[in-house]
Amino acid sequence: MSAFFAPTLRSAPADATIASHQLLMRAGYVRKIANGLFAYLPLGLRVRHKIEAIIREELEAIGCLECTAPVVTPAELWKESGRWYRMGAELLRAKNRLDHELLFSPTAEESFTALVRGDCTSYKHFPLSLYQINAKYRDEIRPRYGLMRAREFTMADAYSFHTDCACLARTYEKFAHAYRAIFRRIGLSVIAVHAHLGAMGGQESEEFMVESAVGDNTLLLCPHCTYAANCEKAVGQRPLPDTHDTHLKDEHEGSDLKTPAAMREVHTPHVKTIEELEHFLHVPAHRCIKTLIYRIDTVPQAAGHFVAVCIRGDLELNESKLEALLRVPSVVLATEQEVYALSGTPVGFIGPVGLAQRAAAAYAARTPAFFPSAAEPASVTSDIPFFSLVADQSVMAMHNAITGALKVDTHLVQVEPGRDFVPDAVADLMLVRAGDRCIHCGAPLYEKKGNELGHLFKLGDKYTRSMHLTFTDEQGVRQFPLMGCYGIGLDRTLASVVENHHDTRGISWPLAISPYAVVLIPIPHTQAPYAAAEALYVQLRTRGVEVLFDDRAERPGVKFADADLIGIPLRVVLSAKTLPRVECTTRCGAHTYFFTQEEASEHIARLLEQLASPESS
C-alpha cells in the first residue's frame, strides 16, 4: 500500500448524508469532482470491474452479445423516436462546430435500433440480444446521495429484438432470471415490482428494488400473495369508510341528497376544499367528486393542452398513472390563472358538468396571454387534444354525488356520472397507500422504501416503428420487430451493497466483489514480521488469492482502522508478538483464527472458500 493510491479520511464530507456516500469517500473508493460527478479511485474501480464481470457472465450465459454504442448521439436519432421533443431538461444537449445537434445519452434505445436496422432485415436474423456497459448522463436537477443519484453513471443496458410476442416474453423471462442471479451473486436481496413505463414507453415494465431506508421509491407489497408494485404503478382497493350516512340532508335547502333526482345547485359560500364541503353539507368525502386540471407538459412547451381529472373526494390522484393514460412524459397542475381562463371559474368550484363546453369556448377565444401555444401552433404535439376530461374508475360507481358547479360559491348536488357528464376516458388513477386492499387476495398492502437497481421493459414496436426498422417475415411481408430493453445501474448497485454491508467501523464487502480478498498487515513494519509477510504474500498470490499488502510505515492502530474502513473480507496479521502463528480475522462477524506460518496459506485459501459459499452470505 505504500505505492497504492487509496487516500482515507477520518471524517466524511459535510454533503455526504447517507452511509454509502460517506464510506466510499472516507475509504478512498471515489472522489467528487463536481456536483453529481465522481471519479473512481483504484479500489472503487476494482469493485466496479468485479460487478461488471458478474454481469457479463450472466448475460452471456443467456446468449446476449456485448458491443458498444457512442455516448454522444446525434439528435436525428432521438427526433426519429420523438424523445428529443418529449424529454425535458434532463437531456444534456450540445452542438458541435458544424452546428450539428448532439446529446449525451441517458439511455440507448435509439442507438441500438439504428445499429440493427442496417443489417437485420430478415426473420432469420432474430431473435437478437445485445448489451453494453457504458457511461450515461442525465442532467439531474438535484444530484444527491453520492453514487445513488449522480449525473454521470455507468449502466449495463441490453436490447433485444424479436419477430413475435412469444419470443419477446421468453427473452424477457431469461433476463429476469439473469438479473436475479446477478444481484444474488453481488450480495443483494432484491424485490421485483410492477413499474411505471415513464418516458421509455412500451407495454410492460418491471423494476428490481433493494430495500433501503433512504430509498427514493415507495413500494406496495402484499403480505399474503406475490403482488408487489412501485407506488407509481400500484393498484388497490380502498373500502368506503363506515359513515352511517343513511339519511343525509342538505340543511341549506331541506331536501334529501340521497334521493335520486335531477341535479341542482347549492349555495356554498367560501367553501373551496373537500374538507370544507364535508363540514358545510355534512357529507363524507367519498360523496364528493374532486376535479383537478392539469397542463400537459411537452417539449417544446405546449401550454395549451389541458386535461381535467375527476376522482372520488377521499382519494388522491396518481400523476404517473395519468401520464401513462395520456401517453405523455409529464403533467403539471394548471395555475389558478390557467384554470380561470379555461373554465371561467376560480379554483375551488371546478366540476366536470359543462366543463368541456367551457373549455371549447375558451379555446375558440384563446389569447397568447393565457395559452402561449396559440401563438405557435406548430410547436404543439398534433395528436394531443386541446382539452379532455378523464375520470378515475371510482367516480363512475358514484351516485348522487357532489361537485363544483363552475360558479363562484356554488356546488352541484345529486350529480349522476354518466348522466350529467361523460368523461372521454375512465381508468384506474388512484394513488395506492398502505392499508389499501390487494386486488388479488384482499389483504391490506404495506409499504417499504426501496432503490431501483435494475429495470426490464417490453417496448413492443415503439422504437422500431418510429425509426422504421423492419424485417421480412416467412411470408415475405414487412414487419416491425418487437423490442425489449433491460438495464442495471452499476454505480447504484455498488452503493447499495455498501448500504447493506457496513457497520460502525466501515464497509464489509461480500467476497465476490471485494477489491481484494485479503489485507496483509506486518507489525512492526521491519524485521521478521515483514519478511514473513512477504513470504506469505507470495504463497497466497501463487494460489490466486488477491492480496493487498499494507507495507506502510504506520502505527498498528492506523492500519487496523483503515482495514476495517476499506472492508476487505479477511485481515491477516503477522506480529512479532504472535509469530510463528499467523492471526486471521474475518471482517464480517469478526471471527479470529490462528495458523502456523507453514500452513497459513492453505488455511487462508480454505477460509476464503467458506466465505465465498452462499451459506456465509
UniProtKB/Swiss-Prot annotation:
What Pfam families does UniProt report for this protein, alphabetically?
Answer: HGTP_anticodon (PF03129), tRNA-synt_2b (PF00587), tRNA_edit (PF04073)
Which reaction equations make up its catalytic activity?
A: tRNA(Pro) + L-proline + ATP = L-prolyl-tRNA(Pro) + AMP + diphosphate
Known PROSITE patterns for this protein?
AA_TRNA_LIGASE_II (PS50862)
- UniProt record, GO biological process: prolyl-tRNA aminoacylation
| One term under GO cellular component | cytosol
Q: Which UniProt keywords apply?
A: Aminoacyl-tRNA synthetase, ATP-binding, Cytoplasm, Ligase, Nucleotide-binding, Protein biosynthesis
Q: Could you identify this protein by its name?
A: Proline--tRNA ligase
Tell me the domain comment: Consists of three domains: the N-terminal catalytic domain, the editing domain and the C-terminal anticodon-binding domain.
Where in or outside the cell? Cytoplasm
- Record note on quaternary structure: Homodimer.
Top-level taxon of the source organism:
Bacteria
* Primary location class: cytoplasm
Which family is annotated? Belongs to the class-II aminoacyl-tRNA synthetase family. ProS type 1 subfamily.
**One function term, GO molecular function aspect:** ATP binding
Query: Taxonomic classification, please?
Result: Bacteria, Pseudomonadati, Spirochaetota, Spirochaetia, Spirochaetales
Function, as annotated? Catalyzes the attachment of proline to tRNA(Pro) in a two-step reaction: proline is first activated by ATP to form Pro-AMP and then transferred to the acceptor end of tRNA(Pro). As ProRS can inadvertently accommodate and process non-cognate amino acids such as alanine and cysteine, to avoid such errors it has two additional distinct editing activities against alanine. One activity is designated as 'pretransfer' editing and involves the tRNA(Pro)-independent hydrolysis of activated Ala-AMP.
